[in-house]
């Protein structure tokens, strides 16, 4: 750690890139801490210095208002290199956006990932305060409980218990107490497993349908606060007269207006069976609020259809409207309303499973009906919905059911109660086993022509169809490109399967191309396309080609690269024939017309196999014309040079990791360079953190590179672009650097120095340091000749243990290094190795 030269400094760091997407504050914060400064995370009154670059305007204004010293990042670097507290006035900060309008200034969004620290009460003060507040609130609730609030506690094993402090007057609470006590006695879980449900159904099959563990009195359900204006009217007034059809149509149209689902929830669907229908006496006074709350809770269970897919809001809305239409047709029939006792048996099979199946297949209703029916308000809809539904439930109750209902009904009946076991079991059955239930609904009475038309308009026949179909190859290829927006059953399906870049689809196209080659006349050939990768029940689902244009482009790019890679491996005609049969033919033809270089590079067997197909070429003329537009952007991208990596490389040497991180971030920001670990042919700049003679510095000098200090990067970061290198060149420490750079700039071809051009052949000892390869490279770059054997050399570099000759000079490695550094051949007498 450096000396605490900035021990009296309290700094606030705000260093951003010029476009506001990169935050470099962390690196300079580390440097300040190493120098003994205290870094504040917030701009408080203790801050004495603000390290500022392209920061927020508010920070700049606050610093100027308080008189805090505003310095640039160069001040931090100068203090670190000098090892002393430098005067701040020498490195003032600049605010480039000070005079810009607030409309022009961009919002900042740092693209760097943040360090995620899990918040706990120990490391987060706000979380600790919230935790303490919750603990105090819980303690207050335990000590100061209201008289009418029951206590729900959990035992150590997790079971729910009920511990009332005083007697509760409300019947609602007493009913809940009975229910919880009953659950505790029976050891009944809130959410029993499937094995528990099956065990309950086997233990008590006779009482599973009419079990009513709790009896709620009429007074509890009929409190005055739950009544709305029109709820006292009887069911006959609402749904039994001739005006019921108009009301139902208003109700159905209002569903779209208020965007609420009328899917029958499992709680409401239970009423369609015998066990949970309310009595005739109390139905017109049942609570609408409770009904609606139960409906909203249980709608969640119906948002997934039986196949496990999530139903979108549009599908739910349309499904609810189609379901409402079915119920309206059956309920509004004069025969049905007048002879309830006779027709109840036929409408019994309309169970929850059938209704849910219908929800999953619902489709959108005609838009004309939507416009006509947007009239009712939210207040008038839901009570009517409840009452009409309740009247529909009444029609499903037979004579024996009324006797069973006289024992009472539980208002806390939940989905996991044993009463609903039969219904839940029917939901879990596969869709095929539930399909035979739906024709029972249509057998209630004959439908009129208008009703049949509306049912067919709302039905989805996409699942009815053949699993294989015949497509003509002419239509298949021509409509692939010429009519991309047409999504017919045959052509659209074939197009989507050929354009997709998935491997299975590509193999399918290969098989199609192979079949076409086998026939003598390709234009009139008709064959069957099979879709093995598609799931059953979705054979005729069509994919619009508008959404797959990107996939078409990717397919073109992918196949063109595959052609380049695969054609180079083909050596004879038979292999070329096999290759052409295993890829989509229209891609091959397009590539042949796109690049003349690829035509020349193709082997004879491959090009012959393409040319010998006149039928295919005729068929696919339109395909190539369509794909030319897709290939043009790729060619333009190549011509413009975008997307390529930078050809210049930058090498760092004698630089600590924190400086390297800054350089990497600046290079990523300003572009134009890629970073290399060692000097190579593409290296143009060598950055040296300290003026030390390293191998990378010597190689950079020998190759004519810029040898620069670290300040060049900082000033480039300050100004937002790469600046001139000359003021930052380390020519004082390495005099040869500017000379070699000038020679490299003036040379016409590849640069090679002339320093050792007049010297005899040299042999580099294997025991030399630096390594042999690097020394040989240095000698070669400076124009010298390196011999592989010592007997052919007049100069031996490095320690040599063999037999020595009097005519050979045995020199130290430093002779080469010093000569390159000073750009002159040093006197060999000063570097002779001892005999």
Curated annotation (Swiss-Prot):
Matching entries from CDD domains are given as: BRCT_microcephalin_rpt1 (cd17716), BRCT_microcephalin_rpt2 (cd17736), BRCT_microcephalin_rpt3 (cd17751)
Write down the superkingdom of origin. Eukaryota
Q: What does this protein do?
A: Implicated in chromosome condensation and DNA damage induced cellular responses. May play a role in neurogenesis and regulation of the size of the cerebral cortex.
Q: What tissue specificity is annotated for this entry?
A: Expressed in fetal brain, liver and kidney.
Pfam families associated with the record: Microcephalin (PF12258), PTCB-BRCT (PF12738)
One GO cellular component, as annotated: centrosome
| The protein's name in its UniProt record | Microcephalin
Further remark? MCPH1 deficient cells exhibit a delay in post-mitotic chromosome decondensation.
PROSITE patterns, per database record: BRCT
Q: Which residues carry this modification: Phosphothreonine?
A: 335
């Amino acid at each position: 750690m450096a000396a605490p030269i900035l021990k009296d400094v309290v700094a606030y760091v705000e260093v951003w890139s010029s476009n506001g997407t990169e935050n470099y504050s962390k690196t300079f914060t580390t440097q300040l801490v190493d120098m003994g400064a205290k870094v504040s995370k917030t701009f408080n009154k203790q801050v004495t210095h603000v390290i500022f670059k392209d920061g927020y305007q508010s920070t700049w204004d606050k610093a100027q208002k308080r008189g805090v010293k505003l310095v640039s990042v160069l001040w931090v670097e100068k203090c670190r290199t000098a090892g002393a507290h430098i005067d701040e006035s020498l490195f003032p900060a600049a605010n480039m956006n000070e005079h810009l309008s607030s409309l022009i200034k961009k919002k900042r969004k740092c693209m760097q990932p943040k360090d995620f620290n899990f918040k706990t009460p120990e490391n987060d003060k706000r979380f600790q305060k919230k935790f303490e507040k919750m603990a105090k609130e819980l303690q207050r609730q335990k000590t100061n409980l209201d008289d009418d609030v029951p206590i729900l506690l959990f035992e150590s094993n997790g079971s729910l218990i009920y511990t009332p402090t005083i007697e509760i007057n409300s019947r609602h609470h007493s009913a809940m107490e009975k229910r919880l006590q009953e659950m505790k006695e029976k050891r009944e879980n809130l959410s029993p497993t499937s094995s528990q449900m099956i065990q309950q159904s086997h233990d008590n099959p006779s009482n599973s349908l009419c079990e009513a563990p709790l009896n709620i009195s009429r007074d509890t359900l009929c409190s005055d606060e739950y009544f709305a204006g029109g709820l006292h009217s009887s069911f006959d007034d609402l749904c039994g007269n001739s005006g019921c059809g108009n009301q139902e149509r208003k109700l159905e149209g209002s569903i779209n207006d208020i965007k609420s689902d009328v899917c029958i929830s499992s709680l409401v669907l239970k009423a369609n069976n015998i066990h949970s229908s309310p009595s005739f006496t109390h139905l017109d006074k049942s609570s609408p609020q409770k009904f609606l709350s139960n409906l909203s809770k249980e709608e969640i269970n119906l948002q997934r259809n039986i196949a496990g897919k999530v139903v979108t809001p549009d599908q739910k809305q349309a499904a609810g409207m189609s379901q409402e239409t079915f119920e309206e047709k059956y309920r509004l029939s004069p025969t049905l309303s007048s002879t309830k006792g006779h027709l109840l048996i036929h409408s019994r099979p309309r169970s929850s499973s059938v209704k849910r199946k219908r929800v999953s297949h619902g489709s959108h209703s005609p838009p004309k009906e939507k416009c006509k029916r947007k009239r009712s308000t939210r207040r008038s809809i839901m009570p009517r919905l409840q009452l009409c539904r309740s009247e529909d439930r009444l029609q499903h109750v037979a004579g024996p059911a009324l006797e069973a209902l006289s024992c009472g009904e539980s208002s806390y009946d939940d989905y996991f109660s044993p009463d609903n076991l039969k219904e839940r079991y029917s939901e879990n059955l596969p869709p095929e086993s539930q399909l035979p239930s739906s024709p029972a609904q249509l057998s209630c009475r004959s439908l009129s022509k208008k009703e049949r038309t509306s049912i067919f308009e709302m039905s989805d026949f996409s699942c009815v169809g053949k699993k294989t179909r015949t497509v003509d190859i002419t239509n298949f290829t021509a409509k692939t490109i010429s009519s991309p927006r047409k999504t017919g059953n045959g052509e659209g399906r074939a197009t989507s399967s050929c354009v997709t870049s998935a491997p299975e689809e590509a193999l399918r196209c290969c098989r199609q191309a192979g079949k076409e080659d086998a026939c003598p006349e390709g234009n009139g050939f008709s064959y069957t396309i099979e879709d093995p990768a598609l799931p059953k029940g979705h054979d005729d689902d069509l994919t619009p080609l508008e959404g797959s244009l990107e996939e078409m482009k990717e397919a073109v790019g992918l196949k063109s690269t595959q052609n380049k890679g695969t054609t180079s491996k083909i050596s004879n005609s038979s292999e070329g024939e096999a290759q052409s049969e295993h890829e989509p033919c229209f891609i091959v033809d397009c590539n042949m017309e796109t690049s003349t270089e690829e035509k020349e590079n193709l082997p004879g067997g491959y090009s012959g196999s393409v040319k010998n197909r006149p039928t295919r070429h005729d068929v696919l003329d339109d395909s190539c014309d369509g794909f030319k537009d897709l290939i043009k952007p790729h060619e333009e991208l190549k011509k413009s040079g975008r997307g390529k990596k930078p050809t210049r490389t930058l090498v760092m040497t004698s630089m600590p990791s924190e400086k390297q991180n800054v350089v990497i971030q600046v290079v990523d920001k300003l572009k134009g360079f890629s970073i290399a670990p060692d000097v190579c042919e593409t290296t143009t700049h060598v950055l040296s953190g300290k003026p030390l003679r390293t191998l990378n510095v010597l190689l950079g000098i020998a190759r004519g590179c810029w040898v620069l200090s670290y300040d060049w990067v900082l000033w480039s970061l300050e100004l937002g672009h790469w600046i001139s290198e000359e003021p930052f060149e380390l020519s004082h420490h390495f005099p040869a650097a500017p000379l070699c750079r000038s020679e490299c700039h003036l040379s016409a071809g590849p640069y090679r120095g002339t320093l050792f051009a007049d010297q005899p052949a040299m042999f580099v000892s294997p025991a030399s340091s630096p390594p042999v390869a690097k020394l040989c490279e240095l000698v070669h770059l400076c124009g010298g000749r390196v011999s592989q054997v010592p007997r052919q050399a007049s100069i031996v570099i490095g320690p040599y243990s063999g037999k020595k000759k009097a005519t050979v000079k045995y020199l130290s490695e430093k002779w080469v290094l010093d000569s390159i550094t000073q750009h002159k051949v040093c006197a060999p007498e000063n570097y002779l190795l001892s005999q």
